[in-house]
């Protein structure tokens, strides 16, 4: 006679959820592909410290079992205790609500401004990289630089909790590692994958570098590249370049 222990002797709230993340595969059909939304969820789950599995989905030959699991849905999506969830923003909210303290880290930023910092960069970058008219290039590059400058200023401006009101020292520049402090938050999971794409693609197809004078952005990227949560969820530079090979337009007269 088979005996079943209630949840292996664990209370419902103590049992690890069964989570599977499905992300876009790279050009080889197996490695991690270029998809900032896939990386965003990958980073969130990694930072939460929860056990989860990752499956890369080759969009060219999507397996039948995945078609049945999430019909008509492109990655990223997750299954959480066998329930399919497909909207990235809603998945983020759900994970933050369900995977909560004391067992899991809270990842919401303390400062609301961190959520919107750099939010317009990707749109300006897309316009810049998709443009094929040489006469429009300079203005579009200026537009991108303006949004990068705004992010740089935010990263270099001290947050309220960096300023000690009782100290005689006047702190003019922030030394924090990430958008909202010295730890990654949901805001970083959203922005960093996009900022990395901007850096790689603009260099490859426009020979554009983020100016070294933007010390806040470079400090931010350097700190991100030192973290497994970012580098191990990131597609290779080659994969990012391949993804944009048809999107990035040559400047032709």
Curated annotation (Swiss-Prot):
It catalyses: chloride(in) = chloride(out); thiocyanate(in) = thiocyanate(out); nitrate(in) = nitrate(out); iodide(out) = iodide(in). Induction: Up-regulated by calcium ions in differentiating keratinocytes. Up-regulated in myofibroblasts. It is found in: Cytoplasm, Cytoskeleton, Microtubule organizing center, Centrosome; Cytoplasmic vesicle membrane; Nucleus; Cell membrane. It is a single-pass membrane protein. Inhibited by rapamycin, amphotericin B and IAA-94. Its main location: cytoplasm. Signal peptide: none annotated. It is an enzyme of class 1 (oxidoreductase). The chain crosses the membrane at residues 37-57. Keywords: Acetylation, Cell junction, Cell membrane, Chloride, Chloride channel, Cytoplasm, Cytoplasmic vesicle, Cytoskeleton, Endoplasmic reticulum, Ion channel, Ion transport, Membrane, Mitochondrion, Nucleus, Oxidoreductase, Phosphoprotein, Transmembrane, Transmembrane helix, Transport, Voltage-gated channel. The modification Phosphotyrosine is found at residue 244. The modification Phosphoserine is found at residues 4, 132, 167, 236. One of its GO terms (cellular component) is chloride channel complex. The active G-site contains a monothiol Cys-X-X-Ser motif which mediates glutathione-dependent redox catalysis. Members of this family may change from a globular, soluble state to a state where the N-terminal domain is inserted into the membrane and functions as a chloride channel. The redox status of the active cysteine in Cys-X-X-Cys/Ser motif likely determines the capacity to adopt a soluble or membrane-inserted state. A conformation change of the N-terminal domain is thought to expose hydrophobic surfaces that trigger membrane insertion. In the soluble state, catalyzes glutaredoxin-like thiol disulfide exchange reactions with reduced glutathione as electron donor. Can insert into membranes and form voltage-dependent multi-ion conductive channels. Membrane insertion seems to be redox-regulated and may occur only under oxidizing conditions. Has alternate cellular functions like a potential role in angiogenesis or in maintaining apical-basolateral membrane polarity during mitosis and cytokinesis. Could also promote endothelial cell proliferation and regulate endothelial morphogenesis (tubulogenesis). This is Chloride intracellular channel protein 4. It comes from Homo sapiens (Human).
